[in-house]
Structure formats: structure tokens, C-alpha cells
Amino acid sequence: MKASVNNTLVNYIDVGISTASPVILIHGFPFSHRMWTYTAGQVEALAPTHRVVAYDIRGHGESEVGDGIYTVELFVDDLIGLIDHLGIAKAAVVGLSLGGYIALRAIERNPERFRALVLCDTKSEADSNEAKIKRAASIKAVKTNGPRQFAENFVANVFAPETFNARPDAIKLIQSIIERTAPLSLCGSLLALASRTDTTSSLAKISVPTLIMVGEHDAITPPSAAQSMNQAIPGSELFVIPNAAHMSNMENTAEFNKHLFEFLQKLGS
């Protein structure tokens, strides 16, 4: 389905029990909502008991690219615009990597719109100077070599070594999603990541139930970053997902879903 949000068509799915508590799934960069529908994925696990909304961030998946001038603030505007469009007053939000950055800024800006927070393979800190330089190098690489080469390099860094043997279909799916992403969107999103604000100072103000999950082998947003958020967010829960790196929801789906489902069940209706 498509919704017109901030003059951009945003692609989304809205499944499950329409009268149940809504859960919003926000994917990472540079993926799409399909990372949540991978075999026995989160959409399938939650749909029997929840209303599940998973969408493509602008410029990703089947959403419109627009002008390619992206910021995390704009991504938050789109999130709020989408839940307004869907008539959702308050939701549990689940964000992985970039999705986590969006969720953290959204709950900082609009805390009244969220009843729970799930942060996966993400962190509250803004990019360091070193990270910004790496983003700039990635933009140059996309412009020079195109999405296909970028995709090959990217998947090598986000999956645990054992995943390449255990779940080659997951690798293939993510690589194909990246390859189909417009260079303008890849570059615009890299700039958005590099310019995002640091939300660390707001973690102590988060008052909704919060679950944090991270792959034990995540080198991009490591377990130490998850532990720091866990210590800062009052009453938050932390689980380190074994046999997983930065794509913990796809690499160890059973473990990830177990913790997610149990957390959401505790919230009640």
C-alpha cells in the first residue's frame, strides 16, 4: 500500500489484527520493510496477536526517492506522518540500526505517540569525525562504482561470518535490496546518518518500556553501545543475540522473535 506523506509516496504493509495494539517496524539502511518479512520473520510472528505496520523509509524499497536531500529529522516527520495517516494515536516502535536512530529521535521529539520502544543493533551516539569521513568515502564509492559494488562491500560488514553459510538466502535478499536502491537515495541517506543528532542525553528521560537487542558479533553498533543505552534508560531490558552480527533479526530469528514477542506480550492491550 502507498500513503502520501510529506509530499512523498511511502510504501507500507498494515497486517494482523486491526483492533489490536499497533507495532511499527522501521528497517535499517539501506534495506526495506522486507527485512522484517524474511522467513519466519517479525511480521509473521506478530501478526496473529498485533496490528503490524512495516514501511519503507523514503528512498528505500518501494517508497519514492524524492529530492534525495534527507535528514533523520525528515525521516521522523515521515514516521509521524504515516502513523497520523493510519489513525494510530500511540504505538510500540521497533527500529534496527537507522530505524533505531529514527525511533530514538522520534521518542525524543514526540514521546506522547509511543507506548514502548525496541532498539535493535543501534546506538544513541552521533557519528564521530572518523565515521563521518567513512560516510563521505561511501558516498564517493557509490558515485564511482554504483550500488552493486556498494552492496557487496556492505553485506560483508553487517552479517556474522557463520550467516554466510547458515543463511545464504538472507544475504541474497539484503544484497538484492541494496542493489535496487537508487544511488541518490544511498548518498542522501549516508548524509542523513552523518548529520544525525546525538540522543544520549535524552535516554534518561525515556519513560516507556524499552527493550534493547544486539547481535553478539555486531561490529557496527557493538554490544558495548547497547549496554550503555541499557544503563541510561530506566528499567530497560537488554538481550545479546548469539550467532548474529548487525542483522540480528534475520540471523537468529527465533531468539530475536522470542524476546520481542515476550516483551510486547507484557505490555498488554
Regions found by a protein language model. Name each.
Residues 28-32, 97:
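Active-site glycine-rich loops that stabilize anionic/oxyanionic intermediates
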Residues 206, 212-214:
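Short beta-strand/loop motif that positions the catalytic acidic residue
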Residues 244-257:
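Catalytic histidine-centered segment of alpha/beta-hydrolase-like enzymes
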Residues 101-152:
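Flexible "cap/lid" loop of the alpha/beta hydrolase fold
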Residues 216-221:
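Acidic catalytic loop of the alpha/beta-hydrolase fold
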Residues 127-133, 144-205:
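Conserved alpha/beta-hydrolase catalytic His-Asp/Glu region
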Residues 223, 227-246:
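Catalytic histidine neighborhood in serine/cysteine hydrolases
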Residues 8, 13, 34-94, 110, ...:
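Active-site loop/oxyanion-hole signature of alpha/beta-hydrolase fold enzymes
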